[in-house]
């Protein structure tokens, strides 16, 4: 029997509840609910708003956390950034072969695709606490917990992650550097691109 942090019985599986952009220039988060076309990865309705220091309120409905936010039209720039995250993550899922509930949730949200030339993959390890890939002409993409991707500190990002963790989410950060790291070390110039909010799937009674 699997339980979440609150003791609720779960299926032992996870899902990506939301994908959010992180704007390093303005230290803001693009807030939206996770409603996407499974074929194209594009938002199926206007479900995004750009707001500084967004506060999320959550309520329990049928055992699952439902976000209550003010929804506004997603801008073209934000839509392109979300599509780029889908593109990168699809390629990463095709070269990373982790077998666990989190990886399964990511593969379900980001179907594998193989249209970027891989230089080398960076598999997850218990020492590094992150995984990633280096693509030709694109640089390095890493995915993991914020404190391991940015051990030197990124206060604003850590505050955002902490606020979502208090709501019961597990947060993974996608980060990018234009540098092509030669091994498994974090490259210079690493910047956060987005956050994946992951929840346990509640078992139906």
Regions found by a protein language model. Give the residues of each.
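Short, acidic loop-to-helix structural element flanking the phosphoryl-transfer center
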Residues: 198-205
